[in-house]
């Protein structure tokens, strides 16, 4: 059953309104895909670190999935799940490391494999399955099916109280299940596309075994979210909204506008790190298409002054985040005086991938970098954050934007990071570097639009590298800076591929324009790194 709200309190979790499957993350690169697959079948899922204490959960899940991970369960430093997971009385599905965790906790029957197993394999069903409940798990599945393996350890024996449901050539315990309890383990990864019928298995677990109601949709989400915001804000308080013009802040602003009307104040901080003519474009866009009056606060000198001499990426993000909050607090005080109201909340367009990337715990996962929407904020911040998109993936945000009637060109606009050009200039940020990065980026994006590539790409930008290269212009030797172009395609920004659709003619044109029109640049590179191992942004 779904979690219920405590009378008199305002729920801050989407899980209060939808049947929720909890995913405990052991550090697998595929963990986020589990959540995505569940949401594709309209079942809500939340991902939390494997160290999550069950007694501290703000909701009761209707099922739990233990993800894969890079460690061996028998290592001293291996992470382990809170045993209380198995006392919740809900179905549990262990995937790869998650399955080995189940086996380790029930007999220590995990050992190094004779051979590592990476790649495709064929699972064969056992002819007789004693565990009646798990016949549902293989509903609509053939007796043999292809799966994707990615493991170095194996089960040395069946855990106490379990039986074998499926096996592969190299894995005699590829699928196991408890004889009496709704606990199942898979040695393979059903969440990846390389397991063609994996989505059916996930659906069977969620719908047939956990009995989840498949009612997760943007239509159901937005009405509940607007009501939640109204309860949280009350009848007289005001909210200031951090607006950048990107799809995230635009959709978030529209949600707030729908919830509290003119008590929402959209504010854009011109931190001096914006794209060319960005403030003017965003002001016109919000006024014309959304009916939202935008206040632009020019704090460029304040930001750039504090970034002087700073080259470390994390320090830059922290400085930008802290300064951002200070500026907003000042603006909130102004609005309080003008409206005789009360400003307690700051809107941010934080998305679920932002949250996942920023999770750090004592286990295999490492914080890759402080995300600009959830990190870099002062611990003593006076404003409370309100993040209506916090539980959504990017494709869900776009679907929500279209549902709210936002114009297609706005919904599908490429993202722009909160720290702006500050993290696209590798090294120290100053006026001269900003001029170079801004002009190069403008040329790149303009040509992408002109040549019909824009809607085929998820994000593109030009970055200024902290190196100089020797070149020749006319008959003179030059020693100038280097621009790196980056364009990626992705469905959720958790993983991404570099875009390979540009023609050589197009790249030649962009390179020529940048070298000729941007003073101080004599070399242009194209970044062909995917995520992972790279991140989308360079800092």
From Swiss-Prot:
What does the entry list as the binding residues for ATP?
244-250
Cofactor(s) for this protein? Mg(2+)
Gene Ontology cellular-component terms listed: cytosol
Q: Where in the cell is it found?
A: Cytoplasm, Cytosol
The Glutamine amidotransferase type-1 domain covers: 20-215
Q: Which InterPro entries match?
A: Class_I_gatase-like (IPR029062), GATASE (IPR017926), GMP_synth_C (IPR001674), GMP_synth_GATase (IPR004739), GMP_synthase (IPR022955), GMPS_ATP_PPase_dom (IPR025777), Rossmann-like_a/b/a_fold (IPR014729)
Keyword Nucleotide-binding listed:
yes
UniProt binding sites for XMP: 317, 475, 531, 537
A Pfam family in this protein? GATase
GO MF terms held by the record = ATP binding; GMP synthase (glutamine-hydrolyzing) activity; GMP synthase activity
EC number(s) per UniProt?
6.3.5.2
Keywords assigned = ATP-binding, Cytoplasm, Glutamine amidotransferase, GMP biosynthesis, Ligase, Magnesium, Nucleotide-binding, Purine biosynthesis
Q: Give every GMPS ATP-PPase domain span.
A: 216-413
Keyword GTP-binding attributed: no
Q: Where is the active site?
A: 96 (nucleophile), 189, 191
**What PANTHER family does this protein's entry cite?**
GMP SYNTHASE [GLUTAMINE-HYDROLYZING], GMP SYNTHASE-RELATED
SUBUNIT field: Homodimer.
| Protein name per its UniProtKB record | GMP synthase [glutamine-hydrolyzing]
Gene from which the chain derives: gua2
């Amino acid at each position: 059953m779904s979690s219920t709200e405590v009378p008199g309190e305002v729920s801050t979790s989407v899980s209060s309104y939808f049947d929720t499957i909890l995913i405990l993350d052991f550090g697998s690169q595929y963990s986020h895909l589990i959540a995505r697959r569940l949401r594709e079948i309209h079942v809500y899922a939340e991902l939390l670190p494997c160290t999550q204490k069950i007694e501290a959960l703000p909701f009761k899940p209707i099922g739990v999935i233990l993800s894969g991970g890079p460690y061996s369960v028998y290592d001293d430093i291996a992470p382990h799940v809170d045993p209380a997971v198995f006392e919740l009385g809900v179905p549990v599905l262990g995937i790869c490391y998650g399955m080995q965790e189940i086996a380790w906790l029930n007999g220590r029957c995990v050992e190094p494999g004779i051979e590592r197993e990476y790649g495709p394999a064929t699972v064969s069903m056992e002819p007789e399955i004693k565990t009646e409940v798990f016949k549902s798990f293989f509903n609509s599945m053939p007796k043999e099916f292809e799966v994707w393996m990615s493991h170095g350890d194996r089960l040395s024996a069946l855990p106490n109280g379990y039986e074998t449901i499926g096996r592969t050539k190299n894995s005699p315990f590829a699928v196991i299940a408890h004889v009496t309890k709704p606990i199942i383990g898979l040695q393979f990864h059903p969440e990846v596309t390389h397991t063609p019928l994996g989505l059916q298995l996930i659906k069977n677990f969620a719908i047939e075994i956990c009995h989840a109601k498949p009612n997760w949709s943007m239509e159901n989400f937005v009405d509940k979210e607007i009501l939640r915001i109204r309860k949280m804000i009350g009848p007289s308080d005001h909210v200031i909204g951090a607006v950048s013009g990107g799809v995230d802040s635009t959709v978030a602003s529209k949600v707030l506008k729908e919830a509290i009307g003119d008590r929402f104040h959209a504010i854009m901080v011109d931190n001096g790190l914006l794209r060319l003519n960005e403030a003017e474009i965003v002001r016109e866009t919000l006024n014309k298409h959304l009916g939202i009056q935008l206040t632009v606060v020019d704090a460029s000198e304040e930001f750039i002054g504090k970034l002087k001499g700073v080259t470390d990426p994390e320090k830059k993000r922290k400085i930008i985040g802290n300064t951002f909050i200070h500026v907003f607090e000042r603006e909130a005080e102004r609005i309080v005086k003008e409206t005789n109201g009360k400003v307690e909340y700051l809107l941010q367009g934080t998305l679920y991938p932002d949250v996942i990337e920023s999770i750090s715990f004592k286990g295999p996962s490492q914080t890759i970098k402080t995300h600009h929407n959830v990190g870099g904020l002062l611990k003593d911040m006076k404003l409370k954050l309100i993040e209506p998109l916090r539980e959504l993936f990017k494709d869900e945000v776009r679907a929500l934007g279209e549902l709210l009637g936002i114009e297609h060109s706005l919904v599908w606009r490429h993202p722009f990071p909160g720290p702006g050009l500050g993290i696209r200039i590798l090294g120290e940020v100053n006026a001269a570097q900003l001029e170079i990065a801004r002009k190069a980026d403008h040329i790149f994006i303009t040509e992408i639009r002109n040549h019909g590539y824009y809607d085929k790409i998820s994000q593109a930008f030009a970055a200024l590298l902290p190196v100089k290269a020797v070149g020749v212009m006319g008959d003179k030797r030059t020693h100038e800076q280097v621009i790196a172009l980056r364009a990626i395609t992705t469905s959720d920004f958790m993983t991404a591929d570099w875009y390979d659709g540009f023609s050589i003619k197009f790249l030649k044109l962009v390179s020529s324009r940048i070298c000729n029109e941007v003073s101080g640049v004599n070399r242009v590179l194209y970044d062909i790194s995917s995520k992972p191992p790279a991140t989308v942004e360079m800092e």
